[in-house]
C-alpha cells in the first residue's frame, strides 16, 4: 500500500479506536493501553532538595494557562498509549518502543512508521508519550485561539523569533522554567522503567514477560532512547538495539528553533541554563545525585548528552561499548538535527567510534518535522524513501 493511502487508513483506525481494533486488510491489531505515572512527585513543592539548590528545581511555579502546578496536570499523570502488532500474535516475544519528537501533540505521522516496523519485524510497537507531550498535554495547549494570543505576546519580546501558536505553550513553559526539559525527561524515564517492570511481571496483555526490548527514536526521542541505552536501567537493556532517525546529536548541536518546536528565547534560555549547570560540575553532580537517588543510573550520562565538551570521555567510552547496537539515519536537509552534529556525537568527532550512520537526501521537498509529507505531487518519491528507511530500520531491529 502506497504511503499516503496507508497514512489515511491508519489515521482513521487510530482516531476511532476504543480499546482494541483489528485491521484485517492490514493484518494488524491496535490496542489502547492505560497507564498511571508514578513520577509526579518530581514536581511537588514538598519534594526535598539539596540545601541551596532551589534554583535547579524552580518548582513549582503556578502552572501556565491552567492555574495548577505541573504535578496536578491529570492528563500527564493518567493517560493512554498505543501498541500495534501483527494479527494472530497471542504473545509478543519482542517490543520496539517508539519515542517521538519535541513539542508533538499528535501521533498521526508515526502510525505508518509503527505499522511497517510491526509488519516487517513481527514485534509489538509501543508508541509511548514523553511527559507533557501528545495526549499527556492539556487540551488548552492546543487551543489555537488561546495559543495565538500567547504567541503574539512572545513575538513582541526582545531577541525572539519563530514564535507561533504551535510552540507557544512549550516555549513559555521552558523559558519560565528551563529545568522542565530535564524533569519531564526524568518522569518519562521513571514511567518507562515502571512499564518495563509491569511487562516482566506478566501484567501486559499479549506481551511475553521475557520479551526483548528495542528502540526507535526520532528527534528528541532519539536523545531519550540513547540515554536509556547508555544507562541500561537494572541491566535490562544489555542486548537492546536502537535505531535513530533525525536525531542522535548532543543538545548543544541541535537547532530546535522552529515554528513547530520552540522559539528562540526558549531555546536560548534552556541552552544557557544547562551550560551554567555544566560549568559548575560539583554542584551539578549533587543535584543529579539527588534526583537519581535510588535509581540504577549513572547520573552523568544525561549531562554527557547535553554538551559536546562536557563529560566527553564518559560519553565516548560508553558509545564505544554500545555502538554496534546503534544505527542512525540523518537527512541532508535536516536543519534541526544536522548530520554534522549527529556524526560528532555518535562517531566521536574524529570518527574513532564505528557507529553506523547513513546520511540520506530525498528526491522531494522535506524537512526535520515532515520527512515524509503527504503530497500528491511527490507521493511516489515519498513512498520510495519511506520504504527505504523502514526496510533498513526493520532489518536492524528484526
Annotated model-derived regions:
Residues 19-90:
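N-terminal cap/lid segment of alpha/beta-hydrolase-fold proteins
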Residues 73-77, 181-192, 378, 382:
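Phosphate/oxyanion-binding active-site loops and adjacent basic polyanion-contact surfaces
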Residues 84-161:
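Short, surface-exposed "cap/lid" segments of acyl-processing enzymes
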Residues 143-206:
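Alpha/beta-hydrolase active-site loop
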Residues 203, 207-211, 215, 226-296:
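Hydrolase active-site cap/lid region
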Residues 217-219:
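Conserved alpha/beta-hydrolase "nucleophile elbow" surrounding the catalytic nucleophile
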Residues 263-398:
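Serine-hydrolase catalytic core
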Amino acid at each position: 500500500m502506497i504511503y499516503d493511502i496507508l497514512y489515511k487508513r491508519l489515521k482513521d483506525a487510530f482516531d476511532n479506536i476504543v480499546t482494541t481494533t483489528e485491521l484485517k486488510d492490514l493484518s494488524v491489531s491496535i490496542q489502547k493501553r492505560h497507564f498511571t505515572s508514578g513520577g509526579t512527585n518530581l514536581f511537588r513543592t514538598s519534594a526535598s532538595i539539596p540545601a541551596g539548590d532551589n534554583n535547579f528545581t524552580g518548582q513549582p511555579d503556578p502552572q501556565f494557562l491552567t492555574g495548577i502546578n505541573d504535578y496536578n496536570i491529570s492528563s500527564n499523570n493518567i493517560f493512554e498509549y498505543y501498541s500495534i502488532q501483527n494479527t494472530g500474535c497471542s504473545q509478543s516475544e519482542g517490543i520496539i518502543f517508539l519515542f517521538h519528537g519535541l513539542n508533538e501533540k499528535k501521533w498521526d505521522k508515526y502510525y505508518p512508521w509503527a505499522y511497517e516496523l510491526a509488519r516487517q519485524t513481527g514485534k509489538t510497537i509501543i508508541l509511548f508519550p514523553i511527559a507533557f507531550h501528545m495526549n499527556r498535554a492539556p487540551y488548552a495547549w492546543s487551543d489555537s485561539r488561546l495559543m495565538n494570543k500567547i504567541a503574539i505576546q512572545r513575538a513582541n519580546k526582545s531577541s525572539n523569533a519563530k514564535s507561533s501558536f504551535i510552540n507557544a505553550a512549550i516555549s513559555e513553559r521552558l523559558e519560565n522554567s528551563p529545568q522542565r526539559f530535564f524533569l519531564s525527561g526524568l518522569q518519562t524515564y521513571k514511567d518507562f522503567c515502571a512499564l518495563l517492570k509491569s511487562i516482566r511481571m506478566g501484567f501486559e496483555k499479549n506481551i511475553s514477560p521475557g520479551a526483548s526490548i528495542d528502540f526507535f527514536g526520532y528527534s528528541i526521542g532519539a536523545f531519550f532512547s540513547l540515554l536509556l541505552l547508555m544507562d541500561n536501567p537494572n541491566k535490562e537493556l544489555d542486548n537492546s538495539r536502537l535505531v535513530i532517525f533525525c536525531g542522535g546529536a548532543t543538545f548543544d548541536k541541535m537547532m530546535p528553533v522552529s515554528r513547530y518546536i520552540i522559539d528562540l528565547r526558549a531555546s536560548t534560555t534552556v541552552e544557557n541554563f544547562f551550560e551554567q549547570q555544566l560549568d559548575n560540575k560539583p554542584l551539578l553532580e549533587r543535584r543529579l545525585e539527588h534526583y537519581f537517588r535510588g535509581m540504577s543510573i549513572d547520573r552523568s550520562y544525561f549531562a554527557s548528552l547535553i554538551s559536546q565538551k562536557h563529560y566527553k570521555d564518559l560519553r565516548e567510552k560508553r558509545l564505544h561499548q554500545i555502538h554496534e547496537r546503534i544505527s542512525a539515519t540523518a537527512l541532508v536537509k535536516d536543519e534541526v538535527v544536522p548530520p554534522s552534529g549527529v556524526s560528532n556525537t555518535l562517531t566521536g568527532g574524529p570518527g574513532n567510534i564505528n557507529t553506523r550512520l547513513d546520511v540520506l537526501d530525498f528526491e522531494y521537498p522535506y524537512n526535520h518535522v515532515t520527512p515524509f509529507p503527504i503530497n500528491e505531487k511527490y507521493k511516489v518519491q515519498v513512498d520510495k524513501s519511506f520504504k527505504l528507511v523502514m526496510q533498513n530500520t526493520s532489518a536492524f531491529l528484526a
